[in-house]
């Protein structure tokens, strides 16, 4: 029997206060799975409090002392106040999402930022947003259901990459599950890629495990031949990652810093990282990145850029949307 598309939704994310992108995604997940397609600020605070009662590690207690705190009324009241303040802060950030995603955000938020609701009539781009939301929430998705999300996410990333590259560029998936151009052992695939980008590979097959069919940190590869066969062409490599917490480490997997010692080209290639998370925020009245201190030298395409680029370039959203997952999530009718 197939497992439900989502699990353990009553448990808030084990995330710090500053990881607003994870908390807001949790709110949106609770909203689309709710029997009335809504979720409130009070419900979030209650979920955090219930988790704190059953888990010794309150995710919001970032300055906890080593010693166990005394269990008294004042401590509990202070903790509840902190949970309510955090819930209010998260819903305030949803106002930011409402602003920047505009009509493409599949939710509505009341004027006091107390309750979020799913819009009654969802467009294809709304459903694509929800597909990205589920892809960004794999900790709540049974592992056997991941592929239906991650495969389409890589396809969506490839379609965006095609639009970002100049006319005439070659853009191909390299990930083991998606490619038809690069097949077989990883060494053989890297050898073919090296020829495509007119470089040299300082590796031998003996350097790899005998049955290595991985992707070497590459999910999408692109280059432009510039009309001849000489070295020195524009190249770009990309990694696609759905992890909500491990993305700082994955961001540079496709970069020259990791691969450049073995795959040599006349100049360094551009590095892209595609993520379904929304890391946008406002700082000092200007759009900025959350967690920017964790960024490496990569061009990041997050959920906001996905949605805006898909609409700007008229990329059909339906073929890269996990419709079955979205429909099943909305049909869970949880409280």
Residue spans for each PLM region:
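Active-site/pore-lining binding-face segments in mid-to-C-terminal subdomains
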Residues: 227-292
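Alpha-helix initiation/capping motif
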Residues: 22, 36, 40-44, 179, ...
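Generic structural signal of hydrophobic/aromatic residues within well-ordered alpha-helices
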Residues: 134, 186-197, 259, 322, ...
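Domain-level recognition of nuclease-like catalytic cores that cleave nucleotide substrates
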Residues: 265-335
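Nuclease-adjacent, charged terminal/linker segments that flank catalytic cores
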Residues: 1-152, 335
